A protein has these predicted regions:
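Cytosolic juxtamembrane helix and N-cap/initiation of the first transmembrane helix
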Residues: 1-39
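Alpha-helical transmembrane segments of multi-pass integral membrane proteins
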Residues: 119-175
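Cytoplasmic juxtamembrane regions at transmembrane-helix boundaries
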Residues: 7-12, 86-111
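Perimembrane loop-to-helix junctions flanking transmembrane segments
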Residues: 42-64
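Hydrophobic alpha-helical transmembrane segments of integral membrane proteins
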Residues: 98-132
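Interfacial helix-start motif at the membrane-water boundary
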Residues: 56-78
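Hydrophobic alpha-helical transmembrane segments of multi-pass integral membrane proteins
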Residues: 24-31, 77-84, 113-124, 153
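Membrane-helix interface/capping segments
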Residues: 2, 49, 66, 78-100
Length: 175
């Protein structure tokens, strides 16, 4: 069986480069859309003499607090997604550096599963139709369990890494 060298693995280095581009690009798009959304629904658009129609779902109407809350939840979800990509990039960089059973990997995994938990609850989609006073009225809420499953898998990986670190330390002291 051929041993795979992680330090000189060009595929892993290309993945890190791609993740860097995704992080920078996604962050720039997020900042740009946030600025445009704020400008398009405030007095600034009237002062600048331009009318912008930015479709950053949901559209922000700063006079309606539900709209602002949905906007903040979208920003938070996008920011947490960027942070998860950043953590994955750091994990791959540790693999390239030869740090497999290292405490920094368990710290990254600990941060990652804790980021997945709020993403589970931020993925709730709520839809209401009708008027709650007059019937018919329907209220539907759906929750995606995919981030929760991701949190569980990463937590299990973290526990395996912790056990691997303990075994590696025992082997160092035995020799």
């Amino acid at each position: 069986m051929k041993k795979i060298e992680l330090k000189n693995n060009s595929l892993l280095k290309d993945i890190v480069t791609l993740l860097n581009l995704i992080i920078v690009g996604y962050s720039a798009i997020l900042v740009f859309l946030t600025i445009l959304s704020v400008i398009s629904y405030t007095v600034l658009s009237d002062r600048l003499g331009i009318k912008l129609n930015v479709q950053f779902l949901p559209s922000v109407d700063f006079s309606n607090w539900w709209s602002v809350l949905a906007f903040v939840i979208n920003l938070l979800t996008a920011s947490l997604t960027i942070y998860l990509i950043y953590l994955a990039r750091n994990f791959i960089k540790n693999l390239i550096g030869g740090k497999i059973f290292d405490s920094s990997n368990t710290q990254l995994a600990d941060k990652a599963w804790k980021v997945f938990l709020p993403l589970t609850f931020l993925s709730v989609k709520v839809a209401a139709s009708g008027n709650p006073i007059t019937l018919p009225f329907s209220f539907n809420a759906s929750l995606s369990f995919t981030p929760l499953l991701g949190a569980l898998i990463i937590w299990l990986m973290m526990k395996i890494l912790e056990k691997g670190i303990d075994i590696a330390e025992e082997n160092e002291f035995t020799i």
